[in-house]
């Protein structure tokens, strides 16, 4: 009697998983790598290097991820024991925060400043910002007519690269007002000399 032992063959990777390039935060889950395939087994993946599944790893937040993979053999094949690693980056999305333009009349208090947002992904809004928006403007109630920059800063976000855009505060001329009306001088009689006909008036913001 002759016993014949058939040893398992080694499984081989036929399609190597690759990092998906140019990933940027979208607010949704995204595949981190392309799907691999193997002859005589199946490719399995992990984000922690311990728990492996057949599901291609996904991620939502911006950051750097390490995807581990190896091959589990079928009943006739040995798996590939070596674990490979792929580093994948999801870049931050761009968020633009713009200080909205404002205007006041000379002498008025500074307005309530505000901003506009451009670039939110999915359902994101101001709630994802860390910090508080700070407004800086050189205008005060004694400032002259003209334009003043409204600068902003003070916030950041995990998934966004923030661009701050300054606004413009325009200070317009105020209307001059008469504070003392000129009045006719009564009972003038010819005297042969020049005479003042009215009392002198005065104005605020002019003459």
Residue ranges and their predicted role:
Residues 1-207:
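Solvent-exposed beta-strand/loop surfaces, strongest in extracytoplasmic domains of secreted
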């Amino acid at each position: 009697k002759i016993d014949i032992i058939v040893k398992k063959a080694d499984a081989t990777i036929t399609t190597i998983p690759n990092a998906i390039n140019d990933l940027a935060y979208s607010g949704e889950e995204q595949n981190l790598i392309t799907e691999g395939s193997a002859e005589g087994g199946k490719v399995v993946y992990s984000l922690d290097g311990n728990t492996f599944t057949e599901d291609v790893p996904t991620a939502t937040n911006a950051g750097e991820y390490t995807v581990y993979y190896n091959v589990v053999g079928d009943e006739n094949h040995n798996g590939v024991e070596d674990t490979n690693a792929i580093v994948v980056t999801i870049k931050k999305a761009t968020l633009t925060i713009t200080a909205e333009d404002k205007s006041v009349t000379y002498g008025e208090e500074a307005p309530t400043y505000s901003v506009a947002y451009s670039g939110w992904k999915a359902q994101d809004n101001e709630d994802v910002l860390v910090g508080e928006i700070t407004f800086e403007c050189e205008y005060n109630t004694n400032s002259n007519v003209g334009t003043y920059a409204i600068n902003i800063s003070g916030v950041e976000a995990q998934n966004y690269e923030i661009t701050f855009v300054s606004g413009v505060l325009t200070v317009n001329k105020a209307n001059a007002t008469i504070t003392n009306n000129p009045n006719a001088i009564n009972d003038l009689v010819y005297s042969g000399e020049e005479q003042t006909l009215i009392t002198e008036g005065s104005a605020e913001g002019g003459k």
